[in-house]
Amino acid sequence: MKIYKKLFAYVQDKKYLGVLAIIFSAISALLTVYGYYLIYKFLDKLIINSNLSGAESIALKSVITLTSGAIFYFVSGMFSHILGFRLETNLRKRGIDGLEKASFRFFDLNPSGQIRKIIDDNAAQTHQVVAHMIPDSSQAIITPVLVLALGFIVSIRVGIILLALTIIGGLILGAMMGEQEFMKIYQESLSKLSAETVEYVRGMQVVKIFKANVESFKSFYKAIKDYSKYAYDYSLSCKRPYVLYQWLFFGLIAILIIPIVYFMTSLASAKVILLELIMILFLSGVLFVSFMRMMWYSMYISQGNYAVDTLEALYEDMQKDKLVHGNVNNFKNYNIEFENVSFAYNDKAVIENLSFNLEEGKSYALVGSSGSGKSTVAKLISGFYNVNEGSIKIGGIAISEYSDEALIKAISFVFQDSKLFKKSIYDNVALANKDATKDDVMRALKLAGCDLILDKFPERENTIIGSKGVYLSGGEKQRITIARAILKDSKIIIMDEASASIDPDNEFELQKAFKNLMKDKTVIMIAHRLSTIKDLDEIIVMDSGKIIERGSDKELMSKDTRYKSLQEMFNSANEWRVSNERVL
């Protein structure tokens, strides 16, 4: 099937385990049905011929045969489970390897929690379709054919009854199997509910503070209602067929007793009928299990299809709009040039025909309202996205001409939301430069103003962040991030609102760290706190993806400019105080 072709592509070296699982499962089915044939011969000796001594040897053979069938099924399951676990591992590895090479755009658009959930949960969803369904589907196909053959060996009546059961059971089974499109919608609603639940839990502080109920979170509430509806509809669609299915198989013997007793004419015929009833009881149970396996097979195939399609869509998205790198490793200089650059997010234009130059060694601030394009400019310089039109150059060469390693080494990015790993403070800084010595790392920590942070902990730079109650404030995290950037020693520094939410206690230390980081570098700073950019060489004011003003703080403040009005609004907001006076 198509699903297995997709899945086995990720376990080429272990594909033989699937073949072995099918072979052992088929042998198990043959042994199991042959075991029931021996049971029939045993009952024939015992009931019809009353030959107890002959029945004993057959009984022993049937026990050995059925036990052998169970062992072969266990071995089949062992093969398929090894294959299933290897598949899950490889799907997760494929995701992790893809993350290492993914475009910056991918990380910009996809939260880390969502990525982890998609990879982990969908890899786990493939387990049933491989580990359980490979042996079960083999038995579900082979066993009914063998059971029907055995039924006709017992008697024409038994064969006809089992054939009728097979036909009716197959029709009922078809009614119980969900349509592929419906199952896809059901899976999507379940994924949506899981994602919204995570967001709801993350916002639990807000929920408690404002005593908000679940209806207040519209997307979460809608996800609950949608999933509830689809789960209820699916249950209702299966209710009648499933009840009829169980009634058909489990009530069959009771249904047959009355006509059998009515047509029974002698003790001999009673013995034959009793034997047939017992065999119908046994063989209908085997058919019931086979049909149930087919039903689960349909459901797990739908789950597996959805899981692998979701994962492959994620893998594809990782490479989407990825900057194709060249092989240039050296920069002539670090001047940055935009030439008629246009860029759009999902067909929504953000920057159109933008051109400007930034000189090496100077510091620049990008200011403007939300959506003006300043963050997009910074991300385009870093190679987060491919431009739709035009080109971006560093040192007179398009950034796409540089190798990946050269571009990463040349540019450091300091984000507003600092990310630190659950490792020591030292390791969090040292990862910026694998060749750095301990003296280099400690110097970077000192220049970033981290001495006061280290003094708080007995183990200083060896303190593990996030363990034993060790947690850092936003400003402290930012200083460690700056130490990392100092150690990397890139020639271009991009700071995306790096001081936007820093508390006053940390601001002074942070500003000193910024000065050490920015020394002799080309700096692009995106700032909302306009007080932090007055000393920069040049301020670039953006609006609707265009540069509307450019100059030093002194130049722009001396004229009637948009920048001047932004500074006045910023200063006015800072002067505002909450008073105890009643506002009339």
Where are these regions (language model features)?
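An intracellular "coupling" helix at the cytosolic face of ABC transporter transmembrane type-1 domains
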Residues: 9-16, 104, 121-130, 134, ...
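Cytosolic ends of transmembrane helices, especially the final helix of ABC transmembrane type-1 domains
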Residues: 193, 212, 239, 287-316, ...
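A hydrophobic transmembrane-helix motif
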Residues: 27-41, 68-71, 135-177, 236-284
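Membrane-integrated ABC transporters
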Residues: 1-31, 52-58, 80, 125, ...
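Conserved "ABC signature" C-loop
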Residues: 11, 415-467, 489-494, 505, ...
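Transmembrane-helix motif of ABC transporter permease domains
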Residues: 16-32, 47-88, 275-282, 289
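Helix-to-loop junction immediately C-terminal to a conserved catalytic motif
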Residues: 382
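C-terminal portion of ABC ATPase nucleotide-binding domains
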Residues: 512, 529, 534-584
